[in-house]
Amino acid sequence: MSKIRRKVTVENTKTISDSTSRRPSVFERLGPSTGSTAETQCRNWLKTGNCLYGNTCRFVHGPSPRGKGYSSNYRRSPERPTGDLRERMKNKRQDVDTEPQKRNTEESSSPVRKESSRGRHREKEDIKITKERTPESEEENVEWETNRDDSDNGDINYDYVHELSLEMKRQKIQRELMKLEQENMEKREEIIIKKEVSPEVVRSKLSPSPSLRKSSKSPKRKSSPKSSSASKKDRKTSAVSSPLLDQQRNSKTNQSKKKGPRTPSPPPPIPEDIALGKKYKEKYKVKDRIEEKTRDGKDRGRDFERQREKRDKPRSTSPAGQHHSPISSRHHSSSSQSGSSIQRHSPSPRRKRTPSPSYQRTLTPPLRRSASPYPSHSLSSPQRKQSPPRHRSPMREKGRHDHERTSQSHDRRHERREDTRGKRDREKDSREEREYEQDQSSSRDHRDDREPRDGRDRRDARDTRDRRELRDSRDMRDSREMRDYSRDTKESRDPRDSRSTRDAHDYRDREGRDTHRKEDTYPEESRSYGRNHLREESSRTEIRNESRNESRSEIRNDRMGRSRGRVPELPEKGSRGSRGSQIDSHSSNSNYHDSWETRSSYPERDRYPERDNRDQARDSSFERRHGERDRRDNRERDQRPSSPIRHQGRNDELERDERREERRVDRVDDRRDERARERDRERERDRERERERERERDREREKERELERERAREREREREKERDRERDRDRDHDRERERERERDREKEREREREERERERERERERERERERERERARERDKERERQRDWEDKDKGRDDRREKREEIREDRNPRDGHDERKSKKRYRNEGSPSPRQSPKRRREHSPDSDAYNSGDDKNEKHRLLSQVVRPQESRSLSPSHLTEDRQGRWKEEDRKPERKESSRRYEEQELKEKVSSVDKQREQTEILESSRMRAQDIIGHHQSEDRETSDRAHDENKKKAKIQKKPIKKKKEDDVGIERGNIETTSEDGQVFSPKKGQKKKSIEKKRKKSKGDSDISDEEAAQQSKKKRGPRTPPITTKEELVEMCNGKNGILEDSQKKEDTAFSDWSDEDVPDRTEVTEAEHTATATTPGSTPSPLSSLLPPPPPVATATATTVPATLAATTAAAATSFSTSAITISTSATPTNTTNNTFANEDSHRKCHRTRVEKVETPHVTIEDAQHRKPMDQKRSSSLGSNRSNRSHTSGRLRSPSNDSAHRSGDDQSGRKRVLHSGSRDREKTKSLEITGERKSRIDQLKRGEPSRSTSSDRQDSRSHSSRRSSPESDRQVHSRSGSFDSRDRLQERDRYEHDRERERERRDTRQREWDRDADKDWPRNRDRDRLRERERERERDKRRDLDRERERLISDSVERDRDRDRDRTFESSQIESVKRCEAKLEGEHERDLESTSRDSLALDKERMDKDLGSVQGFEETNKSERTESLEGDDESKLDDAHSLGSGAGEGYEPISDDELDEILAGDAEKREDQQDEEKMPDPLDVIDVDWSGLMPKHPKEPREPGAALLKFTPGAVMLRVGISKKLAGSELFAKVKETCQRLLEKPKDADNLFEHELGALNMAALLRKEERASLLSNLGPCCKALCFRRDSAIRKQLVKNEKGTIKQAYTSAPMVDNELLRLSLRLFKRKTTCHAPGHEKTEDNKLSQSSIQQELCVS
């Protein structure tokens, strides 16, 4: 992280130990020279200003360090007795609790500093220990700098004036230190700042000396090279205290938030430093940096000297324990400090004996700090905070000199950590938790004071992240260390690794070996040095160190106890912290984490930060008092197990001292000079006490460390085992996934093989199909070549499409049928399986997230789930969908890829799901293909039907392949949407492009020919698609059974109805069967419908339902049936069925198609034979509807009704239903071309109406609502809207009206909710989908039953009206054809591009919408009522409740869109008005609020603005893909597009919008994206309170927060302002820019565009100016 220069007052343990009265010199702070040498100036330093031993130097570097009035006098002045110092420390803690907490990071150097902190606090506050920025360091930087003042002020007990005086003293000291450090800079560079939290540091933690807090907050977290030098300063300032400072920086980075050392040991000087430090640390950051550099040199030199002395002396004195504790403390802290501990470790613990290790350590710590700057900061500071705290008690006893030296001598740290790691781990864990919590609480509290909470939260999140990462890295490292421990035990590891693992494990091994060897050496040296030095410097410092070490050891024990209590791993974490600090020093990130004793201990600090934040952050003085008491208690507890009596006595003494200090802190604020003297005395006493205590503690700590090490080793082993287990699990999971994938692939391959064999057999039976298969193979090869030449053939694709379309148009129906069958079989091979669960494929496909990611995924998911594009979009795995979107124009070339890839994806699923379905399908296909063949032969055009059966067999093969090759079907759906959807898509394409309409004609002729077989294959494809799509819904088996039953029934019905209505094999035509069904439907239409044109017209009629075509051609079958059956009875049932089927085609294409076919047959039978309608429709409908309701209903309600019907309710559905129905009647009356034209025109009209919706914000209802239908299936399924839609389609006008009016409000609400939920409720989608699906299954079952009853009623009505309306429809369609054909031409141009991507969505959507429109129109109007009836049906539907708003939209679209739709006939108006009146009455009845209800009973959704649901027509989702809608959504920039193209686009969009007022606002913003953004914002805002989800009455917090966020965003946020705040622009500047823009547009744009440009340019320029 970036180096944060923190003003950290680092107290030298040396100075503290030397004299409490005099402010310790930098060198004394850097490390205690031996007691006398602490007072004795280093001769080398006096001569050269440089000392090789740096911080380890036993002698005072600089005659003036003490002489600057603070060092010796401040330290050793008996006026500042240790007790007074402690009391002052406590008082300062209490007074400066916030300050020390702020400065704990800064001043974690030590309470020595606290004692001398008044003088040195300034220095150390000025000492900018530049820590690498970690989230914590950054947090603490801000915190301790700003909150230092705040904390200084925060600890108001600490007088600000006193703080100023202390600050001034500190400044003086810092000046001296800066001079000294400048002199010793070179040596400091050599000397590693061993930020081992020495007992002083622990004391400083306990008595949060400002220096400790500063250092704890800033130095380590900021630890960078300067942090190391600052750490060196800390070490210098308190060589022992600097380890403590390091630990206290770690723990006080934690504890600065904890605000107060937990140990009662008095850190009085710290408050002074804190008080002054906060203010002057900033001033002296530069000085402190310089001082840090010099101190780093001195610290290194002194560290060497001290290490030598410590090695010599502490070897005799409590060697292992102290050193372990300091070393581990330092290890935690120093490795936290960065490389210091690591470098110390990297030489190996043996380096401890050598002065060079300190240099290396010093070098490494800076390096590591910089290397792992943020880890070092945040980690090392937490580690320092955490790991040192535990180790501080021994280190405290050693004295901060020892700790600094130990931190300098990393091996000592290793030994001490090994010894103290048990204790240290506990204490560190507890301390570091507390200190980290304290530091974080204080630093965070200070941050909170200084930082916005967002910054704090970010930092905390960063810290938490880092902690987690560090925990993870620590766990890894710990496991490594456990492994390396064996290696490191031998010290055979990489120096760093050996250090880190030595730190982690060598502390154990070294405890075993080095602990006795090196700890005896180094701890004895450092302790003898530290204690002798402390004694030489001053027994006060030693006493202080001891008392602080006691308090810190208490803190450590307390923290160890806490950390044990909190985190049993904390000792391990502590060891990790030590190891990890080393390891983390090795890996800078691991530095952070391991320094954070462990990731878990770090997080546990976060887990329990409130304990510490609570204590320190909230009440630093309280935390100091009570936190220290807690620490004492915990330490006593922790230490009592090790040396309960000693620690209890010491802790009691420390508690008494700290309590005295805490009591005196309030008193001593004005007597800080006396306190300093008393502190010096107390420090000397405490030093002596602490030396003894440290020895005892060191022994106990060594025991504890060993225990902790063992525990840590066990934990690490367990973690390793767990990691290995997790890895094994992951491997097993991966293997299982791979196996499953392989199985899926094998299944797909087997299915492909089986399908190929079937196709071969069928090809043997049918040479035509063989030729078609050859053509398919050729086209596959071509498509493969196209895939190879994909980019080259991108250009040729459109040409090929056009050629194919033209060829298909030009070719004879059979030629077209052969080619299309082959192509469609390609498509079928790919498409039924795409049908299968494109949803699942998406979900399972790796590209699903990428492809469907974001809005595309949501929208496409919506569209795919809503728009029944089972073959295409759903089955298209996201990759395929991506491919489809990318290359739908390229799809012909990419078809083989998609087919193969989607076959891979889908066939995997299909092999699983469809393996049985394929068998069933094969059986049903064979049976029904034969049935269909016989029926088709029996039916009209036996030759055609044979061709159809042949093609149906081919298509059955293809569909088996398609179902097995869902992606092939997708690709072929894409190609087949180019080819097969030249059947389906070209039908839908007719909606967009007449060429495809022609193709659709020929395609549907093909379909008619191949109806029977394709019916079977379609049904089976629908079965598979049900299984794949339906499988999402549980009743897959039921669906299969029902589908098979329906297949049988369809075959029977086909036989009977083919006998009756020869063309009525429609129910079985699901996708491809629609060809045959269309043929039969054409014939039936020809035979049945008097006005029906010859079968070519009928064949054209099935194409008119592109929705059905895409669906499974179910709607084309339904349309064929509707057309054949005069589109009244049949279209009602067929539309109901196809509505069910169309949505269900996604889910239940088979049932939907079968049911739609059955109902189509029923309706046809009804039309042809009303008694049959009553009998067969009643029988078939009721059982089939019930079945459908159960299986289809569930799936439908899941996807089909909710998505399909909700889609279909959109304008496209109503328009298309009207259009398709009228198209059917027109086709019946006028002709297939007219129908196709009408379809294209109607679809264009639908687009227009939907674009009007889009402009109105209805794109939400049609587009967004349709998205939300798919997305928030729940809202519609769960919402009565889906039920309404079901009811409106199936229910009688009354039941529909009532249900729908109820549902309308819910539907409107939910549509708006879903619009909003499109964004807001996408999270709800999954849950909502499943929940409403279940609800809607039942509802849809019931409603479909009601529908069929109502359908029968409506069919009678509609039959009467169909005759009159069909004539009007012919007129209307002719008009609309003429009107829309021009639009379709432009739409074709725009959509030709969008077609590839959107057509397929549109085709499926249009199929959905057409099928749903047909269903609605047939159900609602019960008759295909011309284009007027489309509006009428839209209105009737909306008036009937489902589509009231939709129909209103259709009305507005039809009427307000420049009368794109012809006026509604009187019959239609009567029905619409009747339905309107009924539904409005129902709505009013529902709207009428009952008498005051219980709040729970109130439907508060009534309070929501009941936006009249603009008729959501079935193809609402298709609106998204109309060129206008797409351009609206995508937006078009006049500048980029040019005024000419812009004018065209605007024209197209305006045409499609059908609302001139909306067209004016089409491109309000010149930046296209802004238009859609503004639209979406409007929709979002409008629907905020509407789309509340399935449980509208219960507003969940998530929804509430989402609403609030959106409200803030939309109304107050910058989003709207960025787009709309044109007033921000200077008017003159705007005028000039407008002039320039006009000139540019005049140059670039034709004259006619200039006006638009001027109009648009003014608004858009304003916005551009705002935006740009």
Swiss-Prot record:
* Biased composition annotated in UniProt, kind: Low complexity: 204-213, 323-346, 370-382, 584-593, 1084-1100, 1125-1153
Please state what the protein is called: Zinc finger CCCH domain-containing protein 13
Q: Where is the composition biased (Basic residues)?
A: 214-224, 958-969, 996-1010
Q: What is annotated about its quaternary structure and interactions? A: Component of the WMM complex, a N6-methyltransferase complex composed of a catalytic subcomplex, named MAC, and of an associated subcomplex, named MACOM. The MAC subcomplex is composed of METTL3 and METTL14. The MACOM subcomplex is composed of WTAP, ZC3H13, CBLL1/HAKAI, VIRMA, and, in some cases of RBM15 (RBM15 or RBM15B). Also a component of a MACOM-like complex, named WTAP complex, composed of WTAP, ZC3H13, CBLL1/HAKAI, VIRMA, RBM15, BCLAF1 and THRAP3.
Position(s), cross-link Glycyl lysine isopeptide (Lys-Gly) (interchain with G-Cter in SUMO2): 179, 194
* Polar residues bias locations: 10-23, 239-254
Native organism is Homo sapiens (Human)
Instruction: Tell me the keywords, alphabetical order.
Output: Coiled coil, Developmental protein, Isopeptide bond, Metal-binding, mRNA processing, mRNA splicing, Nucleus, Phosphoprotein, Repeat, Ubl conjugation, Zinc, Zinc-finger
Q: Which GO terms describe its molecular function?
A: RNA binding; zinc ion binding
